[in-house]
């Protein structure tokens, strides 16, 4: 099977030379999402809102790939301030059920458009 680009009109358009996701066989690779409102392409205000927007954007891309958030097996989270790590954990519980995906949380100096958080992931379909 060839790789297929996945794009959702309900998630922010790519701001570079990448697809929102790529599907190959039973694997889906999600590009990073930041807290962009897909209607305005502007960042939502504050870390709390950005975390929610990131997960909502990921869900829209996942839905466009005919999968669900429960198919996420690995999640990578990038934070400009690791003091927000506990808040990410708290909000993740609203979107993911146990068993939670494997995850990395990485502190970074900056993110595109001045975002406070970015997340990407990997899915395996049955």
Predicted regions and their residues:
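Short, polar/acidic, helix-capping and beta-turn segments at strand->helix junctions
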Residues: 2-126
């Amino acid at each position: 099977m060839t790789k297929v680009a996945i794009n959702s009109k309900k998630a922010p358009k790519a701001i570079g030379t990448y697809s929102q996701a790529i599907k190959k066989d039973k694997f889906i690779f999600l590009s990073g999402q930041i807290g962009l409102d897909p209607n305005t392409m502007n960042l939502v205000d504050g870390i709390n809102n950005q975390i929610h927007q990131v997960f909502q954007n990921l869900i829209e891309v996942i839905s466009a790939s005919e999968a669900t958030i429960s198919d996420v097996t690995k999640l990578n989270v990038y934070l400009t301030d690791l003091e927000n790590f506990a808040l990410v954990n708290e909000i993740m519980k609203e979107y993911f059920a146990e068993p939670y995906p494997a995850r990395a949380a990485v502190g970074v100096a900056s993110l595109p458009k001045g975002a406070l958080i970015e997340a990407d992931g990997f899915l395996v379909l049955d």
